[in-house]
Curated annotation (Swiss-Prot):
Catalytic residues identified in the record: R273
Record's function text: Has pectate lyase activity.
Keywords recorded for this protein, A-Z: Allergen, Calcium, Disulfide bond, Glycoprotein, Lyase, Metal-binding, Signal
Species this chain originates from: Ambrosia artemisiifolia
Disulfide-bond pairs as recorded: C53-C70
Short name of any one Pfam family annotated for the protein: Pectate_lyase_4
UniProt tissue specificity: Pollen and flowers.
Protein name (Swiss-Prot/TrEMBL): Pectate lyase 5
């Protein structure tokens, strides 16, 4: 009787330990999921948690909107134009920014209603001036080679936007003028400063599988109250100021910013700001940094930066080995900022001088965290960064 009683205690103890065991990564999932679920994770043809949601499916072209369920990080829940119609871009022209014709990208992006925007064929779209993207939009370049040049996208006071599989490069400073930004008449706008994607006062934004390079100012600038942003699976090359999160040290509205930088590759003559953060809370997870010019990750105004599972391969110059760039404060003060490293891999002499303490996360912060894989996995997790070549009837 006593032996039977002890067996019951042991059984329930083991069951309780199993239930309480945290699930942190794909490896953990493989240990506890049934065999068929484990097989689905490892044979989908994907390399990370976002791509695993959709890339292994040959019917993606018939089910494009399934992508809307795949965002992770602080942009999780961004569904773009899922609840709207499919809008097909049939013309690469942008010759009337005040009254764009139906069939152009600018016409679709400005509409007040939700739209899932796709492209009829390969296109090089030379935007004459900045293109304003309204709320509840998906710009989905899968199935075509879509290049945006000369001017970039502006997201101002909007929510729920997905930008996916778009190549943006050679964005220049452009003058203002009357520009269509919604269903109403065109309104005057100031000139744009050469950002590929400029985001202000917006939320629920997801940029995924884009290739961005060679613009005058930033490739992605997010500021002035923007939050719930994920930049993932993208390729950043040939640029000085890559990602800016936060307008200025004096802009305290950015204290509430939550942003995720995940599964991206930074390479081929990128200099700095990958990202540069002010105020706010940032997870930088499982990215591949293949050399830099000035620094990789930087900031000022006491942001919290959690660097997890990244690969940092430093440049060859001995003076450029530091991963981090601290700005705006004396060294003693900046070493109080919570800039933490976990599971990162440092190569070619890279140096990461952590500071502060591991912060206690709020429920909102915890909910947006992506489980970090070891930095040794960063190369495989980012091997498909940038635009994908997707053909209907086959997995991307």
């Amino acid at each position: 009787m006593g032996i039977k009683h002890c067996c019951y205690i042991l059984y329930f103890t083991l069951a309780l330990v199993t239930l309480l065991q945290p699930v942190r990564s794909a490896e953990d999932l493989q240990e506890i999921l049934p065999v068929n679920e484990t097989r689905r994770l490892t044979t989908s043809g994907a390399y990370n948690i976002i791509d695993g949601c959709w890339r292994g499916k040959a019917d993606w072209a018939e089910n494009r909107k399934a992508l809307a369920d795949c965002a992770q990080g602080f942009g999780k829940g961004t569904v773009g134009g899922k609840d709207g119609d499919i809008y097909t871009v049939t013309s690469e022209l942008d010759d009337d920014v005040a009254n764009p014709k139906e069939g152009t990208l600018r016409f679709g992006a400005a509409q007040n209603r939700p739209l899932w925007i796709i492209f009829e064929r390969d296109m090089v779209i030379r935007l004459d001036k900045e293109m304003v993207v309204n709320s509840d939009k998906t710009i989905d370049g899968r199935g075509a080679k879509v290049e945006i040049i000369n001017a970039g996208f502006t997201l101002n006071g909007v929510k729920n936007v997905i930008i996916h599989n778009i190549n943006m490069h050679d964005v220049k400073v452009n003058p203002g003028g009357l520009i269509k930004s919604n269903d109403g008449p065109a309104a005057p706008r100031a000139g744009s400063d050469g950002d590929a994607i400029s985001i202000s006062g917006s939320s629920q934004i997801w940029i995924d599988h884009c290739s961005l390079s060679k613009s005058v100012d930033g490739l992605v600038d997010a500021k002035l109250g923007t939050t719930r942003l994920t930049v993932s699976n993208s390729l950043f090359t040939q640029h000085q100021f890559v990602l800016l999160f936060g307008a200025g040290d004096e802009n305290i509205e950015d204290r509430g910013m939550l942003a995720t930088v995940a599964f991206n590759t930074f390479t081929d003559n990128v200099d700095q700001r990958m990202p540069r953060c002010r105020h706010g809370f940032f997870q930088v997870v499982n990215n591949n940094y293949d050399k830099w010019g000035s620094y990789a990750i930087g900031g000022s105004a006491s942001p919290t930066i959690l660097s997890q599972g990244n690969r940092f391969c430093a440049p060859d110059e001995r003076s450029k080995k530091n991963v981090l760039g601290r700005h705006g404060e004396a060294a003693a003060e900046s070493m109080k900022w919570n800039w933490r490293t976990n599971k990162d891999v440092l190569e070619n002499g890279a140096i990461f001088v952590a500071s502060g303490v591991d912060p206690v996360l709020t429920p909102e912060q915890s909910a947006g965290m992506i489980p970090a894989e070891p930095g040794e996995s960063a190369l495989s997790l980012t091997s498909s960064a940038g635009v994908l070549s997707c053909q209907p009837g086959a997995p991307c």
